[in-house]
Amino acid sequence: MRLLPLGLFDKVKLGGTPMATNPNRWRTIDIVIASIIAVAFGVIFWAWGLLWNGPADAIPLPGRAVLYGMWLVPAVLGALIVRKPGAAFYTLTLASLVSVAIGTSWGWTLVVQGPLEALGAEVVFAAFAYKRYNLPTALLAGTAAGIVAAVYDAVVWYPETSWTSMRLPYIAITAVSALVIAGLGSVLLVRALAQTGVLDRFAAGRSRALV
């Protein structure tokens, strides 16, 4: 008896009628790669927090916000690689939870802030119906996540400070940092990874001309 190829029933219906594959459905490899990115950046977040509260403490606020974009990279990076609804939200939220588990100085507040920042990026990709994964979209997603993060900080962490001398400049600097580090940085990282071939199972890897 001849065995049918593995996965055949995922592609055909009874009678041989082709069944369309849902492009928005997450594959196992999507979950795995998004989780790997999240765990890796959860550790990076912890180290970045040491930098923020250590050597970088010499840079007064709002200037120190130039470093903020690193905390938003997983949202843009995860979305650019996985290219599925929820990728930005899943990757950054999980990265935030990992950093909480490791022992970040901001503790459980990140359980709320992480998903909010992730939603900022997710909304941008959703606005383009999850079909645009180019440089402008990545820059917008990074900036949106940065604005959400900075507004949260301004309201929760710095409520007593002046809007003109502290909070508005802080929001602006954070947005620019997110645009450059999370937006442009993620694009460059995906390009570098694609050239190695490690992303060949993803659209981001098969299209060498990504973004």
Show which residues each predicted segment covers.
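Hydrophobic transmembrane alpha-helices
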Residues: L6, G16, A20-G78
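Hydrophobic alpha-helical transmembrane segments
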Residues: I31-I36, G69, V73, P85-T93, ...
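Short helix-perturbing small/polar motifs within transmembrane alpha-helices
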Residues: A34-A38, V112-W157, V187
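Membrane interfacial helix motifs at helix-loop boundaries and amphipathic/re-entrant anchors
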Residues: V43-L67, V100-V111, A150-I173
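Membrane interface segments of multi-pass transport proteins and intramembrane proteases
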Residues: N53-L61, A129-Y133, Q195-V198
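Alpha-helical membrane segments and adjacent membrane-interface helices in multi-pass membrane proteins
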Residues: P62-A121
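Membrane-water interface at the C-terminal end of transmembrane alpha helices
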Residues: A127-K131, V180-G197
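Short, highly charged, low-complexity non-transmembrane loops/tails of multi-pass membrane proteins
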Residues: L193-V211
